[in-house]
Amino acid sequence: MQYKDLRDFIGQLEGLGELRRIARPVSPNLEMTEICDRLLRAGGPAVVFEQPAGAPHGDIYSVPVLANLFGTTRRVAFGMGAESMEDLRDIGRVLSALKEPEPPRGLREAGKLFTLAKSVWDMAPKRVSGPACQEVVWEGNDVDLARLPIQTCWPGDAAPLITWGLVVTKGPHKKRQNLGIYRQQVIGRNQVIMRWLAHRGGALDFREHALANPGKPFPIAVALGADPATILGAVTPVPDTLSEYQFAGLLRGSRTALAGCLTPTLSELSVPASAEIVLEGHIQPDPNHPSGYQHALEGPFGDHTGYYNEQDWFPVFTIDRITMRRDPIYHSTYTGKPPDEPAVLGVALNEVFVPLLQKQFPEITDFYLPPEGCSYRMALVRMKKQYAGHAKRVMFGVWSFLRQFMYTKFIVVVDDDVDVRDWKEVIWAITTRVDPSRDTVLVDNTPIDYLDFASPVSGLGSKMGIDATDKWPGETTREWGTSIAMDAAVKAKVDTLWETLFERPAGR
């Protein structure tokens, strides 16, 4: 699907019956979550809540809420410029070629490589003046997050939570900007807590800034309601040589239009010119905090694990200015026990990951992140095994290949005769091909998701690999079982008879 911006995208979705509008008042406090959860579980449409209820003084918010946008894999594919899930493998192949290009083996391959390189070059983002995202500007006391219909998703949540904010940062020693999606707890009229984990790009940029420029505010811009390609580019494993804005242009089929921020100290940051709302501001110094910058206690919030997370300290982002389009749309979501939007995104991005993994490990024939595994905590790998110990090599390869798999706790490796997308087959392989002592790999003291309260130490825990492949000589001294399979000729004969098998012959 080709589109210009978020508004064009949702307009096309509406024409396809993939988006519906809700005209009656609905509160962003819990009610939107319940409605969206039911819609997502039923494979339902994206929605626009036209009358968010509960604004200050009991009014209706003037800003509608867009939700459940990526609630189906089909809409994720549309957002990535594809027409179907199958097309996402092609995006993975492009990323694979960009990540590790191979020398061409002839003129034809050289031509393809040149065409790909030119396509990427042609999608370099462009700066524009008079952008739509700055049609309206709030400054001074007008900067008040209570004027936006920010969701409170679950009964035990500490506060309203910005969920789809595209956070733009830049380290002092880097040429390119970093785009990341980090949740932000509202703690005041113009302040939120920026929850980014230590290894994420935004946190790394902030740490470098604090070391290089101690005591100086750290500039940040947050784009709300960016176009889907830019949002999805921020959560895709884009090669370090390619900017997320450039990749978004490649997905969308048109260069990403960028705008400079209005705040002078944010001059090095660029935001999507078509974004619905932009927050401009800084993390301010605080000499009384050990880090030298303002921090606050974040959480608890219901998360994609299906649990409330524990509280922890994160930087405070103070907003100096809010710019927006005329009649803006607020894009929101919730996270909870799978399935939720992160789980759906995980299933779709899974198809992008497969060609990337196959480039490094050609023996991998399929790869699956089951949504029940909270997007990335469990991976199932199907492979063509070639030697003893091969499955264990693949396990460690997956854990170390992409940053996205650093937090994968469980990897199950099976042979090429097992469908990793069918739990019945995976369980059959585990129960018939695994000896727990021989075929289980445990690795201690590895990076673990901060939200994984099952780990003994926050951010540090163990991983498990299960080798559910047939065992080769050297892995067992016993005669290995042979899988039962019907004769191919008999299967073909029954296939031809099947439709008429229960018909009575004429005259009987």
Swiss-Prot record:
It catalyses: a 4-hydroxy-3-(all-trans-polyprenyl)benzoate + H(+) = a 2-(all-trans-polyprenyl)phenol + CO2. It holds the Pfam family UbiD_C. It is a peripheral membrane protein. It comes from the Bacteria. It is an enzyme of class 4 (lyase). Its cofactor is prenylated FMN; Mn(2+). The keyword Cell membrane applies. Mn(2+) binds at N178, E244. Pathway: Cofactor biosynthesis; ubiquinone biosynthesis. GO terms for cellular component: cytosol; plasma membrane. GO terms for biological process: ubiquinone biosynthetic process. Prenylated FMN binds at I181, Y182, R183, R195, W196, L197, R200, G201. Binds 1 prenylated FMN per subunit. Gene3D superfamilies: Single helix bin, UbiD C-terminal domain-like. Its main location: membrane. Catalyzes the decarboxylation of 3-octaprenyl-4-hydroxy benzoate to 2-octaprenylphenol, an intermediate step in ubiquinone biosynthesis. Belongs to the UbiD family. This is 3-octaprenyl-4-hydroxybenzoate carboxy-lyase. The lineage of its organism: Bacteria, Pseudomonadati, Pseudomonadota, Betaproteobacteria, Burkholderiales. The gene is ubiD.
